[in-house]
């Protein structure tokens, strides 16, 4: 696990980001490689497995957390949680798939951080929207 991923509070089996392509204080590009043997696929759906949208949303939130962790202004921030998600799913994701996760900071206030997010598979958008994270120990100045 890379040091940026280790800054996330998540661990297996609920850590979905397995690669950080690039990250800075405002943007993270990450990836989640779904091989097809993951336990959750056994029931979603037998004979035609699909990656659950709620897990894609969580993976996008983890990518946003990577961007927060890459910001030196939030070096002491510890963990966080997804407090709001407005994500639209454009097409289903069947394994095997490399889900590219993009999160771009749009601003924040106090502990709240707002991100535009997008997930792609083979260049096609599979999910997009906005999420808000609450980061413990974060003291975002008002940004709009």
Language model feature labels by segment:
Residues 1-11, 72-76:
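Short aromatic-glycine motifs in intrinsically disordered, low-complexity regions
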Residues 5, 47, 89-91:
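Beta-strand-rich interaction surfaces with strong enrichment in secreted/lumenal proteins
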Residues 12-51:
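Catalytic strand-loop segment that frames the active site of acyl-thioester-processing enzymes
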Residues 14-16, 99, 113:
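Hydrophobic core residues within well-ordered beta-strands of beta-rich domains
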Residues 18-21, 90, 102-106:
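Conserved positions in beta-strands of structured domains
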Residues 25-29, 93-97, 104-144:
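HotDog/MaoC-like acyl-thioester-processing domains
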Residues 42-69, 81-82:
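Compact, glycine-rich, soluble single-domain proteins
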Residues 63-102, 126, 133-134:
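Hydrophobic beta-strand-centered segment that forms part of the acyl-chain substrate-binding groove
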